[in-house]
Amino acid sequence: MREWCMLRESRTNTPRRAAERGKRPGGSSVRGGERRIVTALCYDLVGSTDLMHVMDIEDYQELMSAFQLASKQAIASHSGVMQHEAGDGGVALFPIELEAKDAASLAIRAGLGIVEACKRVGREAGQDDLQVRVGIATSVALVLEGSREGWTREPVTGAALAMAARLQAITAPNSVLVSEETRHLAGRSYAFVFQGSKELKGFAAPEKVWRALGHKVGVDRFYAFGRMGGPLINRENELNTIGQLWDGVLAGQGSVVLIQGDAGIGKSRLLREIRRRTRAKRSKLLFFQCLPGGFRSTLHPLLNNLPEAVSGSAGQMGPTAAAVAALFERNGIRDPAVVDVFSYLLGAQGSRLQSNEDPKAIREKAHRALLRALEAVCRRGPAVVAVEDVHWIDPTSRDLLGEAARIIAKFPVLLVTTSRPSYASEWLDAANPTRLALRPLDSDETRLAIKAKWPEHRLALLPDLFDATERISGGVPLFIEEICQWVSQNVEPDTMRLSESANPSHVSAFESILESRLQQLGTAREVARAAAVAGTQVTLPLLRALLPDFGKSALANAADTLCETGFLTRIRVPGRTAYGFRHTLIQETIYNAVLRKQRQVLHRRLFTAVNQNRGMAAWIDTGALAEHAERAGLVEEAVPLFIAAGKESSSRSAMIEARQFLEHALDLCGQMSESDTAEALKLLALTALGPILIGTVGLSSEPARRLYEDAVEIARRRPMSEQSQWFPIYWGWWLTGQDFRVMHDRALEVRSMLSKANEPEIQLQVNHCIWAIDFNLGRHRETQDAIKAGLALYDEKRAKESRTEFGGHDAKVCGLGQLALSLWLTGRTKASDAALSRMIAFTDRIAHAHSKAHSLDTEAVSAFYRDDFERLTEVSARMADFAKRHKMQSLSGQSLLFSGWAEAHRTGLASGHARFQNGLSLLRELGAVADLPIYLCMHATLLGLAGKIEPAIEVVNEAIGRGEETGHAYWLAELHRCRAILRARAGERKDAVAADLRCAVEIAESQGATALTRRARHSMRELGIVIGR
């Protein structure tokens, strides 16, 4: 039995707070400040200003002095230190030398003492209504090394001071309000009343706040969990549920399970038990691990099952198609079509699919490949597919996982996924997954878990261990494992004290435990930090680049020590040994504890080394390397890499990831100072993002139009020698013009600007935009001239790239189609037929999806012109089939519209008109109504045939107005002819009918549209209208 075992690996990590600790720039040994827990107290008299107005000034001053003296005594008697004193209030801090629990407890006692002191001072002064408000908060603060003795006299960097002031402001008179962190630390010693979650000015998230009522004797609360390798505790209900689902799988009914829980709660442990219990009857286990930072890395759970992709063996950057085929074959998947699709999506070298294929077609192929892969996997019997930590999944993997979940019921497969509870998993809802939410253990289960882990010769320490576990772990199993291990190894029976810097929040508590353990490991502590910056995978050569002052043997010994102590694990990859963190949470926590400037130094070293030699860490792809550059502060180096990563994703039809990379590149450009370099980088990002935005948001969308307008504004500032480089920007600016007149003016401007450019492709695309606009403006001679000039420059090899850069379709397909339509309108029917045949044959040969859609649209319009309803029915059917296969909504709308038009004329007016209206509604909803005047003309005609003359005239009036407003002129003659016929049927005056027919003739003749002139004159004869030439 083979498993797809995911090598744990992270591209980069999310940086947080901290500051540099370094002996010298670039030095590998870093020292300086550290993060400590600080509790702050803020107090303020209620209504002191009003008192000043009603009391004698001397009496008021004596009252304030007595109050401040009593308040300071209450603070000092509980180890607090005044930070700031105002006339009627002040701020105090409680020393970092105290354990965090004690500092919080003493601060609350001081606060309650201030309330009592205020009451006493008021009574003695005859002011019984004297009242005070007290706020207390706890947070992490940065304490610089060397200033620890006088830390309270230095500015304190932390949230506690600001939060305490905010809490004081909302506290009821003569009350003490404390933050969630403070209550968490001191909760065993005081009674608290929950006051709800409050919005505090300057803080993004609501804060849970509590009112302190007074001291009370200790309240025991125990939290615990089972160790990964120990007995499984408190999971029997979940296992029974999964057992029932597995029985269904054995009977042929697939199921989806989503296990949710906080980091470290035991999701992986439960999954391990599932693997153990299904081992006897399953034929295969496929295991995938999603990783931090993997959201932008296409199919990264699959990619990291490939040794080449992880190790960069043989100098490869990423996998080869042969490696993908070998991996699939080892797991029983031998279908070449399946291997080809996944090789393409992975960006494997030697992939046989073309990068310019339509993204929707690729997605459809991927779904079919997934279906075949599942069939192959189940060929020998039931299987288990496990995907861990889907909260880090990339969009492409999520799409495929969602599709797998949707169809899994057809196969004997148990699909198990795990995620954190905050992750939005509605994309799995269609599969109706069984959701299992893991909770912490209760007190009895805690005792069982700790006894299973605890050495028998130290059982006497268990009561104290329970107390420490309650304060530190918060019921998270992995935290308890680390706490137990550290306490059992380092805590003496007569002290039973943990780190003084134990933090109130669960994650920071774990950070304190890990930091305490790392301090015992000497230089291995620096190696662990460097490895955390690199990600959850690192090699000795990479560590050498990150820590240049360490020798090879020192690094190897440190890595071995970290493996022996449970921080790292060895990962065997071809040609070398790599190291990965035993759990992603360990890597994340160590990374977050590294001060920001130290992280920046390490990221910079990593970027420099890997950028010079990508083979050193081939698992770090372009996007990940860009993130290292960004976190190193090398924004100018990061932006081109993010752009390159976006292009790589786009070439694999991973449009969501591509858009994310490119939009982030633009954000970084905005952070750069105004410079020539920043402008050029921004244009490069916009050039790549524009076509993606058009494809994902829409051609007529405001975001696409605004992007190109902003880009052109920048491009115009660039030197004339660069203008041809930014031609795709100008082309997109033309394409997203709000109407045809604007588009025509822009096309002429671009042609004038780039008239001296010698590149044939630029000149072709200039003509491409001109013939498209001139056609719609009814300028047929100019249209045909532009097509002739443009197609003379067509290069089929270059066109493979241009199809994605310019409009998403092939210029030759567009040119031949536009020529066919223009020739018919100008009365050259045979030449039109020939051009149409050439277009269809060429489109079928190049097999480009969007170009085929363009061709089908042209075929349908051509049949519409000719009133060839039978031909239009056949073309519409092909349009519908193609739209369904490639998920093209606008083409689906056009198929409904044209098939409805044909049906209304051939078989059923009512049913055909209804189908037509469905198509028109869909196109309007999508914003894909560039030919709206024509569609409205068709709509008005069908209304007229149904005898609904007045509504028909209203529709054609709208169409004429839209055509005149937008410059959409080539069908204006037909619109006037249509209105003349409707007016005649409505019995309107003959001069109104004649006026419309006169306009139709004049417009058609001015455009050289012979076919439309003939129609207008034929209608004159039918209606008995005589108009001189």
Curated annotation (Swiss-Prot):
Residues noted as binding ATP in the record, renumbered to the chain: G261, D262, A263, G264, I265, G266, K267, S268
GO CC terms: cytoplasm
Record key words, sorted: ATP-binding, Nucleotide-binding
GO molecular function term, any single one: adenylate cyclase activity
Guanylate cyclase domain mapped to chain residues: 39-168
Gene3D superfamilies with a match to the protein in the record: Nucleotide cyclase (3.30.70.1230)
UniProt-listed SMART domains: CYCc
CDD domains found in the cross-reference section: CHD
Listed GO biological process terms: cyclic nucleotide biosynthetic process; intracellular signal transduction
Top-rank lineage group of the source organism: Bacteria
Chain segments carrying region Disordered: 1-31
Ranges of compositional bias, category Basic and acidic residues: 1-23
UniProt xrefs under Pfam families: AAA_16 (PF13191), Guanylate_cyc (PF00211)
InterPro entries: A/G_cyclase, AAA_16, Nucleotide_cyclase, P-loop_NTPase
Descriptive protein name: Uncharacterized protein R02095
Origin species: Rhizobium meliloti (strain 1021)
